[in-house]
């Protein structure tokens, strides 16, 4: 059985690797860490021009329809080059939620914009510093209006829409689609442990919202987590590969006692 990647998958991987190698070096990362910009806009625009945010989005919604394995290969390259862009929040979380649970009207309205990078999505779930459980959710929806506060929202200050986990009844949770540009939404940047990742506190005050399809919001959230975990694992794989490459290069270049230190192993 052949477990190798297809030619199309290899092509997308190699194009992503080439672009990131040429445009996402240490300078791009340092400009975000030391500057005012929340992410590397030129890198993000380049990724969008290549259609990479729409890798797994079906063609009928403006995406490439290339599937999640191809998206995993893109994620690996993003991790390898530490790309400071809102890819994980918009693609792994927001877009995945819309594709899995959104209504047809919601998909038609937002997936083409997300595929082109014209809009950025995120997921708002956490409310406390403790482990997230169904009982810890107090943000609620009544009569189509959302109220409450969400913490550590990835790229919350730059996203256009959010998929919000909220209480729809005393014993029920749901996922809701919210326009973060609505004036009833208050957003405050919060410093993250990883400065390459932007997070925000988001407060909703009678914010208009609509249900993201139907179903148990908690079970839907686990589905989103599972998909995102695989994609984040590929980012980590890319980061580990980059660290190994740096270690090997150092072992070849660093001399001790007249020999490269790698020769002592």
Regions from the language model: what does each represent?
Residues 48-108, 112, 116, 154-161:
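Internal helix-loop-helix
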Residues 133-147:
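Cytochrome P450 C-terminal beta-domain/meander region
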Residues 117-128:
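A short, Trp-centered hydrophobic/proline-enriched beta-strand micro-motif
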Residues 124, 149-186:
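A short core secondary-structure module
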Residues 94, 117-119, 133-137, 158-160, ...:
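A generic structural signal for well-ordered coil/turn residues at beta-strand boundaries
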Residues 9, 20, 74, 103, ...:
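Residue-level signal for inorganic ion chemistry
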Residues 27-49:
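Short secondary-structure junction/hinge motifs that connect adjacent elements
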Residues 2-12, 52, 80, 185-265:
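Glycine-rich beta->alpha junctions and the first turn(s) of the following alpha-helix
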């Amino acid at each position: 059985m052949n477990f190798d990647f297809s030619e199309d998958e290899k092509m997308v991987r190699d194009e992503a690797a080439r672009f990131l190698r040429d445009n996402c070096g240490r300078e791009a990362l340092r400009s975000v860490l030391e500057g005012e910009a929340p992410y590397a806009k030129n890198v993000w625009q380049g990724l969008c021009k290549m259609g990479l945010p729409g890798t797994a989005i079906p063609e009928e919604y403006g995406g490439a329809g290339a599937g999640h394995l191809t998206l995993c290969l893109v994620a690996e390259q993003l991790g390898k080059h530490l790309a400071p862009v809102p890819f994980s929040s918009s693609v792994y979380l927001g877009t995945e939620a819309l594709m899995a649970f959104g209504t047809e009207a919601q998909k038609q309205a937002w997936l083409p914009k997300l595929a082109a990078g014209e809009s950025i999505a995120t997921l708002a779930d956490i409310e406390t510093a403790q482990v997230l459980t169904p009982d810890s959710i107090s943000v609620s929806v009544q009569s189509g209006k959302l109220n409450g506060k969400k913490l550590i929202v990835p790229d919350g200050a730059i996203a256009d829409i959010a998929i919000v986990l909220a209480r729809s009844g005393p014993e029920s949770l749901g996922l809701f689609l919210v326009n973060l540009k609505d004036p009833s939404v208050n957003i405050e940047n919060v410093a993250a442990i990883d400065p390459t990742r932007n997070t925000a506190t988001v407060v909703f005050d009678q914010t208009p919202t609509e249900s993201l399809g139907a179903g148990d919001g908690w079970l839907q959230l686990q589905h989103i987590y599972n998909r995102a975990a695989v994609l984040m694992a590929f980012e980590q794989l890319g980061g580990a590969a980059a660290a190994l490459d740096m270690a090997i290069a150092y072992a070849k270049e660093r001399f001790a006692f007249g020999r490269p230190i790698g020769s002592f192993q």
